């Protein structure tokens, strides 16, 4: 039984007036191990016949049996599998991928077959050495002569066994000596059992074959007849798809993608700018925002979080009663109240010797310590007797103490002047750092309320009443009781209530709004970057159309081409995402070390931004990848 049997083969291109009937009723048998030359002038149909024989194209009509199997109507991927296992192509223009080395070009068929990298690399190197190219393994096509490139092409054709070698004008682009070397190689392969089908217009070249078939006007014009052939080369066994094979293909696609991306670094960088900026902005800004939020919570928590502030409404259009010490005493008896601190805030100049400072003065009582958790680190708190008698005693905040006593000595027992009134320093308050709005909490002086009223400013209304709660889970209940108690005392709601939980909630709402805005900006930027990826992938497909044809000819299925270019888009986007993360870390470092801003990165946000950028790139790379996968192998090989 012949290896190749063709009956009534026709190939028609175009429709209507553009219709071209290239092959007309071809009948042909070729046995395994034959060396056949198909010779004809330009336009005779010989190249179209070769494309159909090599399963690069399908006939319009007729039958084609290969090793007893009808292959005329096979799917594209099924034909690719047969090409990979059975055929090896040697082209006039060599058709080597310029970005790959000689070794990598030869490996292509085995790579598409799913062969292990080490095994295929060893076989490719052995083939190149057998063809006298052992010293050119790492050379790229443009670094080699035409004869060397054609020998690389022959080695590639033999990579998976090359049971059938299809050579299309293999000497057409070579000098005479290189052409003779190539023909000797093909004759040697035929002698070793390979079925060699040579396509040529040169009758002298054709005469080197054991059988000459002449083609003219799409028909067989002459056939010297079948010659006896030796034992045929076995065909590479068919492999079935598996998860490991798919992962192998994915790894190879990723490796090829990195090589392709590295070939145009400037274009790659420009393409990725949108993704880089989008990822960097969202990760860095959210890190800065989260750092600011945590710093806010830390600062606010320094004076406790279990309090409610009662303040007087300052709307002068409405009648109101001032907050008084009696109001504070009345609130102490309410359920869930742990302490009540009356507070009157004023401004004063405090002096000690040659040093002075303008600072806040708080008139309060001993509940100041319990409500805000604000104790002394030196000396002692003022006593109940100090409160009742309005004693000239006060406590210095650490900033005030450091300003008035810069030599670092303990100011306890020293005298200072508040405006013009002398006071004894009873102690120094522990440091509470900055407030949530950035002011210095330690720039403060605390004294008994009666001392403030009798010795510095005279009688006046309270600024606020701060109520500490025992259980913050009952906050709503306590707020309602405080409101009722104050309305009973004042006859109207001429006051306001504020609590730490509300302040935290407002800050969190602001942060959420900022995050939403940042997310929107980053999404738009990444979206624009995705469009850039799509654009560059369309350009890449157009620039590498011949490469797609070469990969198809060496056995790449549509899925392989799709995975190749989709992986390239995905890797491209992932690199942009990683670059964005690196830029975000740089921005965060500048903010933290250079500007002193709190920065807290989130692994979840970073991974989410990276995944989003990668997914966006993959989505935008899908259409170009599909276009690449659907390219006709014949048309792709014919591209410039």
Curated annotation (Swiss-Prot):
- What are the transmembrane regions? 269-289, 519-539, 560-580, 581-601, 606-626
Q: Which residues take part in binding ATP?
A: 40-47
Localization in the cell: Cell inner membrane
**Which Pfam family is an annotated match for this chain, by its short name?**
MacB_PCD
Q: What CDD domains does the record point to?
A: ABC_MJ0796_LolCDE_FtsE (cd03255)
Q: Does the keyword Iron apply?
A: no
Q: Which UniProt keywords apply?
A: Antibiotic resistance, ATP-binding, Cell inner membrane, Cell membrane, Membrane, Nucleotide-binding, Plasmid, Translocase, Transmembrane, Transmembrane helix, Transport
This protein's superkingdom?
Bacteria
Q: Give an example GO cellular component term for this record.
A: plasma membrane
Keyword field contains Translocase: yes
Chief localization: membrane
Q: What positions does the domain ABC transporter occupy?
A: 4-242
In terms of PROSITE patterns, this protein maps to: ABC_TRANSPORTER_1, ABC_TRANSPORTER_2, MACB
Q: How does the protein's chain sit in the membrane according to the entry? A: Multi-pass membrane protein
Q: Which GO terms describe its molecular function?
A: ATP binding; ATP hydrolysis activity; transmembrane transporter activity
Q: Which Gene3D superfamilies match?
A: P-loop containing nucleotide triphosphate hydrolases (3.40.50.300)
Q: Which EC numbers characterise this protein's activity in its record? A: 7.6.2.-
Enzyme class of the recorded protein, top EC level? translocase
InterPro entries, alphabetically? Answer: AAA+_ATPase (IPR003593), ABC3_permease_C (IPR003838), ABC_transporter-like_ATP-bd (IPR003439), ABC_transporter-like_CS (IPR017871), ABC_transpr_LolD-like (IPR015854), MacB-like_ATP-bd (IPR017911), MacB_PCD (IPR025857), P-loop_NTPase (IPR027417)
User: Which PANTHER family does this one have?
Assistant: ABC TRANSPORTER ABCH.1, IMPORT ATP-BINDING PROTEIN
Q: How does it assemble?
A: Homodimer.
**Assigned protein family:** Belongs to the ABC transporter superfamily. Macrolide exporter (TC 3.A.1.122) family.
**What does it do?**
Non-canonical ABC transporter that contains transmembrane domains (TMD), which form a pore in the inner membrane, and an ATP-binding domain (NBD), which is responsible for energy generation. Confers resistance against macrolides.
**This protein's name:** Macrolide export ATP-binding/permease protein MacB 3
């Amino acid at each position: 039984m012949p290896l190749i049997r063709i009956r009534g083969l026709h190939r028609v291109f175009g429709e209507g007036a553009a219709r071209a009937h290239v092959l007309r009723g071809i009948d042909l048998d070729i046995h395994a191990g034959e060396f056949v030359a198909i010779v004809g002038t330009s336009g005779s149909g010989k190249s179209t016949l070769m494309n159909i024989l090599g399963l690069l194209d399908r006939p319009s009509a007729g039958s084609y049996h290969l090793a007893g199997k009808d292959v005329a109507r096979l799917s594209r991927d099924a034909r690719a599998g047969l090409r990979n296992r059975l055929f090896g192509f040697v082209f006039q223009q060599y058709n080597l991928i310029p970005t790959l080395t000689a070794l990598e070009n030869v490996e292509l068929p085995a790579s598409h077959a799913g062969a292990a990298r080490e095994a295929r690399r060893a076989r490719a190197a052995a083939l190149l050495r057998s063809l006298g190219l052992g010293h050119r393994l790492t050379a790229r096509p443009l670094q080699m002569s035409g004869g060397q490139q054609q020998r690389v092409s022959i080695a590639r054709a033999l990579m998976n066994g090359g049971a059938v070698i299809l050579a299309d004008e293999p000497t057409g682009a070579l000098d005479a000596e290189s052409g003779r070397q190539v023909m000797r190689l093909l004759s040697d392969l035929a002698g070793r059992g390979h079925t060699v089908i040579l396509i040529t217009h040169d009758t002298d070249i054709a005469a080197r074959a054991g059988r000459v078939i002449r083609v003219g006007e799409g028909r067989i014009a002459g056939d010297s007849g079948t010659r006896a052939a030796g034992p045929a080369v076995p065909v590479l066994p068919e492999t079935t798809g598996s998860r490991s094979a798919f992962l192998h293909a994915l790894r190879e696609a990723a490796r090829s993608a990195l090589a392709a991306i590295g070939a145009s670094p400037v274009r790659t960088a420009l393409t990725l700018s949108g993704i880089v900026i989008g990822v960097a902005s969202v990760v860095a800004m959210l890190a800065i925002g989260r750092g600011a939020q945590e710093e806010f919570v830390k600062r606010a928590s320094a004076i406790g979080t279990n309090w409610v502030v009662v303040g007087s409404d300052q709307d002068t259009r409405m009648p109101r009663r001032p907050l008084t010490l009696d109001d504070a005493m009345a609130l102490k008896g309410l359920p869930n109240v742990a302490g009540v601190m009356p507070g009157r805030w004023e401004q004063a100049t405090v002096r000690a010797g040659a040093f002075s400072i303008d600072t806040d003065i708080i008139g309060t009582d001993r509940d100041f310590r319990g409500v805000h958790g604000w104790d002394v680190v030196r000396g002692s708190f003022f006593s109940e007797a100090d409160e009742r008698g309005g004693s000239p005693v006060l406590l210095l905040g650490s900033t005030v103490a450091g300003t008035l006593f810069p030599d670092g000595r303990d100011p306890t027992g020293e005298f200072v002047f508040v405006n013009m009134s002398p006071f004894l320093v009873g102690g120094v308050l522990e440091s509470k750092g900055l407030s949530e709005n950035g002011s210095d909490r330690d720039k403060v002086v605390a004294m008994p309320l009666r001392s403030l009223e009798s010795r510095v400013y005279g009688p006046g209304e309270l600024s606020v009443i701060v109520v500490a709660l025992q259980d913050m889970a009952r906050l709503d209940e306590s707020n309602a009781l405080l409101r009722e108690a104050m309305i009973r005392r004042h006859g109207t709601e001429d006051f306001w209530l504020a609590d730490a939980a509300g302040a935290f909630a407002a800050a969190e709402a602001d942060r959420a709004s900022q995050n939403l805005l940042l997310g929107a900006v980053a999404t738009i930027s990444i979206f624009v970057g995705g469009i850039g990826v799509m654009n560059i992938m369309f350009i890449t497909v157009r620039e590498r159309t011949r490469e797609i044809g070469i990969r198809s000819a060496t056995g790449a299925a549509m899925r392989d081409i799709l995975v190749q270019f989709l992986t390239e888009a995905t890797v491209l986007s992932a690199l942009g995402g990683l670059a964005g993360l690196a830029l975000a870390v740089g921005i965060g470092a500048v903010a933290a070390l250079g500007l002193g801003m709190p920065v807290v990165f989130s692994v979840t946000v970073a991974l989410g931004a990276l995944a989003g950028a990668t997914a966006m790139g993959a989505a935008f790379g899908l259409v170009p990848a599909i276009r690449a996968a659907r390219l006709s192998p014949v048309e792709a090989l014919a591209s410039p």
